[in-house]
Amino acid sequence: MHELVTVLEEFGYTWFSLDRAYEDLTYRPDGVVHVVVESSVIFVEVDERGHDPLHPSYTPLKEQTRMKALKDVAMRNGKVSVVFIRVNTGRLSEVLPQQVETVREVLASIHSSKPKGYHVNYVDYRDDHVHVLESEKKESGIDSVKKFHTENFDEKVRRIRASDLR
């Protein structure tokens, strides 16, 4: 069982694999699991290969469109809160202990504050990546964008970028 799933179970959350599409969407979200908590849905996503905004196959607009579609479907189905926790890693198996701990802290905050609306939490993303979403926050209907960096973030960015150059 993946370490992120273990963290979700610590909070008593029921989780669902995202190896399938969410509700009536025709594509599956990135990552590991989604969690339904009362009238909220939490998407815990592992962005394999780091979603480097300088990489030619990645566009921030695509990411925003996908997340907004997930949010719209959830809200249409009666959810009052949609939260994304996005973890930047090389591969699913490379989520590091510090990142798992950061996800645990974000989940604890969500669990205690029960936020309403649309929130995005980035774990170990470059500032320029997060800035794209922050700058479009109002237009996208996002209530908050938060970023968290673990202590090994800079080293991990170098490693991911080196693997992209191969």
Description of each model-found segment:
Residues 1-166:
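Nucleic-acid endo/exonuclease domains
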